[in-house]
From Swiss-Prot:
Domain FAD-binding PCMH-type as annotated: residue spans: 30-203
Native species: Psychrobacter arcticus (strain DSM 17307 / VKM B-2377 / 273-4)
GO biological process: cell division; cell wall organization; peptidoglycan biosynthetic process; regulation of cell shape
Gene name in the database record: murB
Protein name: UDP-N-acetylenolpyruvoylglucosamine reductase
InterPro entries hit by this protein: FAD-bd_PCMH (IPR016166), FAD-bd_PCMH-like_sf (IPR036318), FAD-bd_PCMH_sub1 (IPR016167), FAD-bd_PCMH_sub2 (IPR016169), MurB (IPR003170), MurB_C (IPR011601), MurB_C_sf (IPR036635), Oxid_FAD_bind_N (IPR006094)
Record-annotated active site: R180, S258, E356
PANTHER family referenced in this protein's UniProt entry, alphabetically: UDP-N-ACETYLENOLPYRUVOYLGLUCOSAMINE REDUCTASE
Length: 373
């Protein structure tokens, strides 16, 4: 984990056509090649690239920003210039007795960042442990888990705006965060995030461990250390344990994490479903809405471990789609499995499921679901 920000500028490196293979650059391990790939080590390299963009036939193709590849579904052929932000560094920008402000470059691995902050005694991100991907992609989805969302700790985002070719510092309000949503997600290929600012607290007694099995597992960690209450580190380790038990490692079994969003439905619809399915899992939301566990819906529809080969749901977590033929399966096969699952769930519960990972079209533009809650 680096501790100082990169500042030296070197020319961005462009890969030639015959090596622009992105099959190993997406955690779903879908077969994909791109016209060219540009690796960005610092912000100056992007400025340099954009100064040439559009002025030469080599730079006349659409742009597509690819971070860690953990939340995307890539096409077999991507007819675009792929920009890969790989800026590295973590820097403390301000610190008091109660909090610390840090600035993290986009290329830092997210889980490594969580481990680093907890080890330093900086808290707030521990519930987001073991989420795959890089820090620069985290604001796009407003990643969340176990009662915490990224926006809870985020102060600002430094991002390049392609239409105006200018840099912007966006506050959390400017980012227009929602459930797994942000301005960056709604305006795809418009922004490239280079760094993210967080405010973390230093109170080791302040934890959020009431979600699911976290409290029980975290309390077990605390008791082993003769503590009466779990610390943020206990919560982090508990969540790591739980996620490792429920979610497959993409390096062992390719996947892109939770494939379907938990749908949000009206309270009266949820109450009606409860009469037929008393065990249905739901969580209260504002405005008399209920967030329903998509994994439960898929499992109750008889699809745990089901799908259309080689894309099937995971045996331990129906919310996750896995790829049984790494680097060979294509986006079209994912589409077939997704359609089968969403149609089956809708026929049984009349609840539409929305895909969480980003669907990338052949020209680098973003595709959207027909089912939206």
């Amino acid at each position: 984990m680096t501790s100082a920000l990169c500042s030296k500028s070197t020319a961005p490196h462009t890969l030639s056509d015959d090596v622009a293979d992105l099959s190993h650059s997406n955690t779903m391990a879908l077969a994909c090649t791109a016209n060219s790939v540009v690796t960005l080590k610092n912000e100056a390299q992007l400025d340099e690239f954009m100064a040439n963009y559009g002025q030469d036939t080599q730079y006349s193709q659409p742009l597509f920003v690819l971070s860690g590849g953990s939340n995307v579904l890539l096409p077999a052929k991507l007819n675009a210039i792929v920009l890969r932000p790989q800026m590295r560094g973590i820097q403390v920008t301000s610190q008091t007795d109660s909090h610390v402000d840090i600035e993290v470059m986009a290329g830092e691995n997210w889980h490594d960042l969580v481990l680093h902050t907890v080890a330093q005694g900086w808290y707030g991100l521990e519930n987001l442990a073991l989420i795959p991907g890089l820090t620069g992609a985290a604001p796009i989805q407003n990643i969340g888990a176990y009662g915490v969302q990224l926006e809870d700790c985020l102060q600002y985002v430094r991002a390049y705006h392609f239409p105006s070719q200018t840099w912007h510092d966006l506050t959390a309000v400017d980012c227009e965060f929602g459930y797994r949503d942000s301005i960056f997600k709604r305006q795809p290929n418009t922004w490239l995030i280079s760094r993210v600012g967080f405010r973390l607290h230093t109170d080791a007694t302040k934890v959020l461990a009431s979600y699911g099995d976290v409290q029980t597992v975290a309390q077990g960690y605390a008791m082993k250390q003769s503590r009466t209450k779990p610390t943020p580190a206990d919560v982090m380790h508990a969540i790591i344990d739980i996620r490792q038990q429920k979610l497959p490692d993409p390096k062992q079994l390719p996947n892109c994490g939770s494939f379907f969003q938990n749908p949000i439905i009206p309270q009266d619809q949820f109450t009606a479903l409860q009469s037929s399915y008393p065990a249905i899992v739901g969580y209260p939301m504002p405005d008399a809405m209920i967030k329903v566990a998509a994994g439960w819906l898929i499992e109750q529809a008889g699809l745990k471990g089901g799908g259309i080969e080689p894309i099937v749901t995971h045996q331990q977590q129906a919310l996750v789609l896995t790829n049984h033929t790494p680097y060979q399966a294509t986006q079209k096969e994912v589409a077939a499995a997704q359609q089968y699952i969403t149609d089956t769930v809708y026929e049984r519960f009349a609840i539409p499921l929305s895909r969480e990972p980003v669907w990338v079209n052949a020209d680098g533009s973003i595709g959207y679901d027909k089912h939206v809650v």
